[in-house]
Amino acid sequence: MSSTTPTTEPDQLPPHLDPQTYPRTTTNPTLNTHITLTYHPLDPTSALSKISSPNAGANVLFLGTTRNSFEDRPVAQLSYTAYPPLALKTLSKIAEDAVAKHELLGVVIGHRLGDVPIGESSIVIAVSAGHRGAAWRAGEEVLELCKEKAEIWKKEVFVDGQGEWRANRDRDAEGKLVQG
């Protein structure tokens, strides 16, 4: 059973969002899944601590970061937007399905919204499992499913001021554009 909890820290929210009703964190204590959408920098140490278990033989942590160029174009930043109620539901299902499929001990998925500067993380994924094989496979699978299914969109903002909106699924694991 998942629960959605609005967090109370004063995020840098766009003015049309009410921080008291904006659902940013969903947890399932039974399956040890934790989903967060935030305008704050992501905390990998916190992600690992949420899934830490004495039964774990492996913890895998992935951080997706904003790099300074894409296809020889200098990037200024990435900007993310989402439909939070549906994105939280989708990300929760991805995490819960991964726990069942890979016999995981826990999953954290955190995604930044708003502007993400060069060098900062836009996504954190942490998985915990009894053995490394399951953890490695699950971590990559969770990432690819997040990019494929989550209702989160990014705008690549280039140094020249131009930008391109993209669904995360527009690129493959090597970062190449997927032709529709």
UniProtKB/Swiss-Prot annotation:
Substrate binds at residues 131-132, 147, 154-156. Pathway: Cofactor biosynthesis; molybdopterin biosynthesis. Its EC number is 2.8.1.12. Keywords: Cytoplasm, Molybdenum cofactor biosynthesis, Transferase. It catalyses: 2 [molybdopterin-synthase sulfur-carrier protein]-C-terminal-Gly-aminoethanethioate + cyclic pyranopterin phosphate + H2O = molybdopterin + 2 [molybdopterin-synthase sulfur-carrier protein]-C-terminal Gly-Gly + 2 H(+). Belongs to the MoaE family. MOCS2B subfamily. This is Molybdopterin synthase catalytic subunit. It comes from Aspergillus niger (strain ATCC MYA-4892 / CBS 513.88 / FGSC A1513). The gene is cnxH.
